[in-house]
Amino acid sequence: GAVLPKSLTIKVIPQFDEMATPNIEDNLFYSAIKIMPASFSDATKKDLTAKYTAMINEKLIPQYKKMAAFLKTDYLPASRATSGIGSLPFGQKLYAAYVKQWTTTAMTPDEIHELGLNEVARLNGEMEKVKNQVGFEGTLLEFFEYVRNKPELKPFKKPEEVIANFEKIYSVIKPNVDKLFSLQPKTKFEIRRTEAFRENTASAEYNQGAADGSRPGVFYVPIPDVKEYNMYGDEDLFLHEAIPGHHFQISLQQENKSLPDFRKYNWFGAYGEGWALYTESLGKELGLYKDPYQYFGMLGNEMHRAIRLVVDTGLHSKGWTREQAIKYSLENEAESEASITTEIERYMAIPGQALSYKIGQLKIMQLRQKAQEKMGKKFDIKKFHEKVLESGVMPLALLESKIDAWIAEK
């Protein structure tokens, strides 16, 4: 049958054990009791607490214990030693279907793997240039380590200073956004520190606002240890998660009254993540990346997405092992081994999803280049961005048809 790789099953078991913790106040399902509104009467609070406690103890914990026991005694011994789904009897066909679903293209795993290798080589060359520019003598791998630990890139003493730095980035790009975008969202935007209860495990992320404007879009930044916070990728991160990345794209889609609801709230990762990754390349046009370390941060994030093309296809169509994928990543990017291991296991668990970012970015960049070449002096970057954003997410083939039609009109 189709079972998870052993290395993933091992990671799942403690999660079920945690959900079955006998210490009721530490149980996730008890959290609602801790945040009951002050307006509730003492009697109501007492009644709800008793009912929640009984439900958790009598219904939920026994089921989680049962599931954890099944995973340990039955599922783990039957889990597979291979890392990718290509090893399953129907795995190659299944992976090809996932690739089509996540990239919204007809590209094959072999084509994507080759594209990834070429992009990794190109970006390695760009990273070497930055390394030489700052006068670092040593290998690129040594430079990765140097950047990760450089004290000047960890200047913050208070979490508020991290948020203030993002506000500063926002103030730098604000005057330049109008030069690239005529179509901009009305939804308000805020930068906030990630809430304490999830900060230790969260990534920086964008949380979309309400379509009616009642709630702003929020860029959340986790700062679990401010003294260890490295700022070298912050300019790039802001463009991707906030403006003009996810905040622009998602807000414009939700605000678009001409779209039916199923399209206002729809999502195609190749388009949505492709757009966010494309906006990282706009940094210089928006007044950023003047510091070589910030530019290196952009290259590092793009490299991370290029590596995904290689390792995802390697794992699921070429028989790569988990260890092989980790080794390839460690040799080509500045992430820690712990972070890379988590990423590789994510690719093992969700085949094809990690391909969407880079495939989408490259398609949008290719369409921009095509429009510039065919339209010449008639090309208007603001109009190009409007055409890409105005109809919301869609498969990349449809986006290409839309841009081709716009080019033909001119």
What role is predicted for each listed range?
Residues 1-410:
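N-terminal maturation segment of proteins
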